[in-house]
Amino acid sequence: MTDSTVSSAKSDPVLVNHEERLGVHSLAVDAIDQVLMNSKLHYLGNAARIIEPMRHLAILTCMDARIDVSALLGLRPGDAHVIRNAGGRASTDALHALAISQAVMHTCEVMVIHHTDCALGRFSQAQLDEQISAASGHRFAEELGCFTDPIGAIAQDVASLRASPYLPARDKIRGFIYDLSTNLLTEVSSRDRTPN
């Protein structure tokens, strides 16, 4: 196969998808390029429109790839805003997203979903600092959201969001823990535990 043949094959999403289905990995295609190709095939002709989430719901959860929010909650595209970060913590960036979600897109309910076996519960701030520093040569000045008490962390995040003046709809903010081993979602009251 010549270089020009490889180049044209890489740009052919049908060929790449066919090879993926067959389990053939002869083409060196980056993961991002692959999902972009899949996106073009899957949504061909379906132009996106800016709409308010149909359920007026925002979900703050962890970036962990094991959590399929749509499958877990039975959501379809357009149902809810899904905001993800490390740990599903109520960080400044999460608050910004929720404030925009409520003010611009009129969401009025928030689910905060943490999960079992979360990296932020398994590593300390110092351990994560060390790993990030070793990989990048830099350290974050701010806390990364590590916790030792999962229930307390959810309670802390829910309480923090309920107290935020930037969220006009604060009465329907609820916290949950998702058990990865059982696939069960359990509600946690913000008064269940006091975080460490």
Language model regions located:
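Conserved beta-strand-loop surface patch within small alpha/beta domains used
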Residues: M37-A97
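Ordered, amphipathic secondary-structure segments that act as subunit-interaction surfaces
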Residues: H106-H115
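Alpha-helix C-terminal capping segments
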Residues: G74, Q102-T107
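Divalent-metal-activated hydrolytic enzyme cores
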Residues: T2-P53, G87-D93, V104, L120-N196
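Fold-independent oxyanion-binding glycine-rich loops
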Residues: C62-M63, N85-A86, H115-T116, Y178-L180
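Solvent-exposed loop/turn segments at secondary-structure junctions
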Residues: R66, C118-A119
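Residues at the starts of beta-strands that form the adenosine-phosphate
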Residues: H56, E109, K172
